[in-house]
Amino acid sequence: MPPKICVDASLAVKLLVQEPYSDQAASLWQSWIEKDIERIAPAFFPFEVASTIRRKYVREQLTKEEAEEAFTVFTILGFTVLMPEALLKEAWNMARELGL
């Protein structure tokens, strides 16, 4: 079974929008790709990230073009969304493997 990591929405936003620690987030993401680590996320993840991008636009922290570009890049980032049943089982298996 290849290694997996569950991605947090705040990390994904840092990949898409210049924020403090965006460079570190990009380095981390790239290292996961290079190490062939599968990026997984819960079912609500895409909605949480899209909502954050939209909120930044509404609050005028992003231009319309920046928001559109961030969303477009988000759709091609490369992560696997797990539905709740699969996510629950995966979390259980990961905890078991880690001895948690």
Predicted stretch roles:
Residues M1-F44, K56-E69, N93:
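Short, well-structured N-terminal submotif of metal-dependent ribonuclease cores
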Residues A9, V49-A50:
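An amphipathic alpha-helical micro-motif enriched in hydrophobic residues
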Residues I33, T75, R96:
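Anion (oxyanion) recognition and catalysis
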